[in-house]
Amino acid sequence: MPAKQSRSTAESRTAPHSYRERVNSTVELAALVYRPLTASGALLSILRGKLYRRRSVRNVLDVVAVHSISGGQGHSAESKVRVEYLAPAEGNANGNSISNIGAAPCADIQGSSDIAATGNSLSTPAQPALLEGRCKMCLLDPTVLKATELWPDPASAAQHRVPVFSLGAAIAGSHVTQQLEAALQAGQLSRKAADLLQQLHERLSRGPSSVSLTEDRDGSEQPQGSPRAAAAPPPPSSKRRASYTGAVEVTFTPRAVELNYQAYTMSELLSMVLPLREHADLVALSGFEQVGHIAHVNLSAAHLPYADIIGQVILDCNETVSVVVNKVDAISSVFREFKMDIIGLRCRTDGVDGNAVAGADLDEFGEAGGSLTAAERQAIALEALSPTYSLAEARIHRLLTATVRQHGCSFRVPYNRVYWNSRLSFEHTRLVDRMGPGDMLFDVMAGVGPFAVPAAKKGVQVFANDLNPVAAQYMKVNAELNHLPANSLRVFNMDGRDFLNSVLFDSVTRAADAPFPGHLCTGRRHVTMNLPAIAVEFLDVFQPLSSTCASASGQQCNASAAAIVNERWNHLPAHVDPNAIDRCTLFHVYCFSAAEDLITDAVRQVEVNLGYTLPPENIEETLMVRDVAPTKRMMCVSFTLPPAFWENLLASRPGQGEEPRGAHAETASTLVEEEEVEQAAKKAKTDKM
């Protein structure tokens, strides 16, 4: 299904790049500056969970403290951010100072030398050193301490500077208390900031083995010995923080941080740029499906005027995405692909005219690096022979062909021309894990091979079919891409009923003399029918002849036309050895259900389309695969054909002296009534996507 490069609507669209300027802002944070650098391990461990966290914003910075009285000597740029704070004057223990110090980014200061650390000594130094030289600056989360909370009176903050304090095991607790109280009395520090410094001092003084506070998993602090703290010991593999027993010089300063669009998550950006409060119908996007480099969204009518902005936000926040598409209509095609619009495109290669950016090395097919397989080149060459072929459409096809990894396999997915659902990855793995070497897999609706390719890679002999010729071609591409052994995956392009009536019939009954030479089933045969909207309807090929008057659509049909559908499984050739028939073939059929009893409803859908009741011993497993909608579930029924079916098939063999039992009335325990078949067909039609 062709994808459009852009939408033509009556509504005007906002320029996609304009949102970036709209989210620019500046936030002022409280920052803790400390030295020596050797105390970083201990301090950062204590501050874990308390630092400012924002994308693309460093919360721990290297800075160099210099005397303000130097007049900025040695700084080449007048626009440098300078933070000023007080250093304790000589002989003044309370921290009041007559000397100012400034801090500038470390990378911008040349020739600065570190002041010698106070050392790992337990004795209190005679006089703390000035906070000068290389330091660390930690940006604090506003929930811990705001910039406006550094001083008691935020209105007079411009006239205040925070003193330098000496903390740690080398400083007596009484001295620290004296420093903090003096700063509080002088209005140079708020009580909240003083409490934080007091906590830092206590944690540094006691060391890692006797810390009085322990962090919970959510970053909150719990008293030592509390039930939550005692119940959550550190994991054995975690590293204990290094202790630091020297003095640490610290101070606070406000720090202005400029935030641009790179600082926000995708959901935050969308909430900021979309007028959610102005339009009740406009809700925040919950996410998107990613298929290789393609992001797929389902936009409502209210979102469409902002489609380009949404596409650009997704590109900006997800480096692995280069194309964003919007699903335009519901899936209605017989091939199960859907119409889509391209609403976001990363500037690498123009998807329409093929103009590449500088330095891009594209081959004649428009593929970077010449990574196409021989089968894929053949598929593209065949497309070029079509009377409706156009270069623009071919470029779109290449742009929307993704490479996906699942089960340790690589899949080339022409996303705009086949059906692919990444949410079924777990189900693909679950089913393939049930198979092994010697088994056979008959995949009736195989797509590009999410079941078939990994099964073949495990040594399973695979016969895979899809009605979509593009899907069938790309199964061959994926077989080559994953270096599958020759003939391990045989690909068919036919209707699913024809596949069941020919390939599966010949294999199960051995009706044909060596239909596939060299393929011998020493394990179990599996049949997958993963098209939940209509897969159960294909089971009508197994119905007894008396049940063929109701078509799959619930409308009465011509008896001779209906007989064609299930004639093969009601007439066993005379040369077939009944003992050679494989009656253990396991079917895995998918369907949708909105019933309260999901399991019963799923089994009943199988029975009414099959035309037989399934005894409990024939139902190996029934499970819910995933939620499709609030009241709709995807189900999988794994079963073998019941004894009544095989009795009916054997009775149809020429020379048995009786007609197929399905041609006559049968008990309700064996055959499902035709009226139920018609009702189930109507229900299945309602459940379609």
Curated annotation (Swiss-Prot):
Coiled coil: none annotated. It is found in: Mitochondrion matrix; Nucleus; Cytoplasm. Residues 1-12 have a biased composition (Polar residues). GO terms for cellular component: mitochondrial matrix; nucleus. Residues 1-20, 205-244, 652-689 are annotated as: Disordered. Signal peptide: none annotated. GO terms for biological process: tRNA N1-guanine methylation. Its EC number is 2.1.1.228. InterPro entries: MeTrfase_TRM5/TYW2 (IPR030382), SAM-dependent_MTases_sf (IPR029063), TRM5-TYW2-like_MTfase (IPR056743), TRM5/TYW2-like_N (IPR056744), tRNA_Gua_MeTrfase_euk (IPR025792). Its main location: mitochondrion. Residues 679-689 have a biased composition (Basic and acidic residues). PROSITE patterns: SAM_MT_TRM5_TYW2 (PS51684). S-adenosyl-L-methionine binds at H428, D466, L467, D495, G496, N530. GO terms for molecular function: tRNA (guanine(37)-N1)-methyltransferase activity. Gene3D superfamilies: Met-10+ protein-like domains (3.30.300.110), Vaccinia Virus protein VP39 (3.40.50.150). It catalyses: guanosine(37) in tRNA + S-adenosyl-L-methionine = N(1)-methylguanosine(37) in tRNA + S-adenosyl-L-homocysteine + H(+). Keywords: Cytoplasm, Methyltransferase, Mitochondrion, Nucleus, S-adenosyl-L-methionine, Transferase, tRNA processing. Specifically methylates the N1 position of guanosine-37 in various cytoplasmic and mitochondrial tRNAs. Methylation is not dependent on the nature of the nucleoside 5' of the target nucleoside. This is the first step in the biosynthesis of wybutosine (yW), a modified base adjacent to the anticodon of tRNAs and required for accurate decoding. Monomer. Belongs to the class I-like SAM-binding methyltransferase superfamily. TRM5/TYW2 family. This is tRNA (guanine(37)-N(1))-methyltransferase. It comes from Leishmania infantum.
